[in-house]
Swiss-Prot record:
It is found in: Cytoplasm; Nucleus. The lineage of its organism: Eukaryota, Metazoa, Chordata, Craniata, Vertebrata. Essential component of the COP9 signalosome complex (CSN), a complex involved in various cellular and developmental processes. The CSN complex is an essential regulator of the ubiquitin (Ubl) conjugation pathway by mediating the deneddylation of the cullin subunits of SCF-type E3 ligase complexes, leading to decrease the Ubl ligase activity of SCF-type complexes such as SCF, CSA or DDB2. The complex is also involved in phosphorylation of p53/TP53, c-jun/JUN, IkappaBalpha/NFKBIA, ITPK1 and IRF8/ICSBP, possibly via its association with CK2 and PKD kinases. Residues 1-275 are annotated as: Mediates interaction with NIF3L1. Residues 254-416 form the PCI domain. This is COP9 signalosome complex subunit 2. SMART domains: PAM, PINT.
Amino acid sequence: MSDMEDDFMCDDEEDYDLEYSEDSNSEPNVDLENQYYNSKALKEDDPKAALSSFQKVLELEGEKGEWGFKALKQMIKINFKLTNFPEMMNRYKQLLTYIRSAVTRNYSEKSINSILDYISTSKQMDLLQEFYETTLEALKDAKNDRLWFKTNTKLGKLYLEREEYGKLQKILRQLHQSCQTDDGEDDLKKGTQLLEIYALEIQMYTAQKNNKKLKALYEQSLHIKSAIPHPLIMGVIRECGGKMHLREGEFEKAHTDFFEAFKNYDESGSPRRTTCLKYLVLANMLMKSGINPFDSQEAKPYKNDPEILAMTNLVSAYQNNDITEFEKILKTNHSNIMDDPFIREHIEELLRNIRTQVLIKLIKPYTRIHIPFISKELNIDVADVESLLVQCILDNTIHGRIDQVNQLLELDHQKRGGARYTALDKWTNQLNSLNQAVVSKLA
C-alpha cells in the first residue's frame, strides 16, 4: 500500500505546508506530531490500538489544528476498513468542523475529495448517501463552490445508480443553476462543469429510454467548445449517443459514437472501454458491415481479450452466416454476452438478420419449399419461420406466398425477375436522359 493510498491520497508529503504559529517549536506541537506518527505506525498491525492512540492526538491538541484533522482522517479510514460505519460517520462529522478555520481551504477540499473517492468504493448506498448529504450540509457555511459541485455530482451518480430519477432531477436543477449566467443561460465559461452535468443527465435519459430529450441534450453537449473535457466524461456522452442512435436504427452513427467512446475510455484508463468495444462490435454487425472492427489500430490489441473474445467469434460467425456457430457462441458465452441489458436488447435483431441471410440462400434454388424443412435448417419453430417469412415478404426481400394449409412457401421467381427488369429499365431511362442533357449542353 502506497503512502498516497495510506492517507486518502492526501499524505503528509503533499503540496501543503503545515502552518505553524510562531511558537511552532513548543513542546505541545512536538508531542502532537510524535503521537500522530506513533499512532500511524500501529495502524496495520493493531487498528483498534491505533484508534485509541489517534484519540490521544485529539485530546492533546486543545485548539483544533492540522494534527487533529490528520488524526481524524486516519480514524475515518480505519473505521471504514473495520466496517464500523456509525463511528466512521461520527468521526467524519467531527472532521467537517475543522474545515472552517483549522486547516486551509485547499487542503480541506483535497482531503474531503479524497475521502469521498475512497468511501465511494463501498456498495452500501445508504452509507454513501449519508456521507454526501452530510458533506453538503457542512458546505452551506463553508462556501466552497468547487467541493459543493463535486459532492452534488457524486450524489447525483448515486441516485442514477439507484434509479431514483426524481431525486436526480432535483440535483441536476441545482447543478444547472450553478452554471448559469444572470440571464438564465448556460455560462459557457464553465464548459467543463456543464459537460459533467450533461453527462449525468444524458445517462438518466438513456436509462429511461427518453430519446427525444436525450437527442437534444446530446447535440447540445457536442457543441460546447469552451471546455477541455476529461476523456471519461466524453466517453460517457459518446456511449449514450451510440445507444440512442442504435435504438433509432442509425447503425453507422452508433458505430461512430461507440468507437469515439471506446477511444476516450481507453485514454482515461476506464474499464468501461471493454463494454464499449462490445457495443462497437454489436453496431458493426447490425450495420451489416463486412469490415472487421478489430482491424483498427485502437481496437486490435483487445482482439484476444477474454472479455471480448466471445464477441470476436460472434462477428466471425455472423459475417459467414453460420447460424449454428452463432447460436453455439451465444449459448456457451451466455453470461458474458446476455448479462448486458443493452446487448440483450439487440441480439434478437442480429438473430433475425442472420436467419434471413441463411433463409434467402436456402430457398434460392426452389419454386416451392416445405416450411418444416426451413424450420429444421434454421433450428427454430415453424411459427417463428412463418413470422420471419411474413416479414421478408412484406419488405420484398422474398417474393412469394405462404400456403399454411400445406405448410409450403411458394416462390414467385418471375415477379422477382420482373422487379429486376423494371429496375434495369428505370436505370436505362435515367442514362438516356443524362446523355441527352450532356448532348444539349455541348450543342
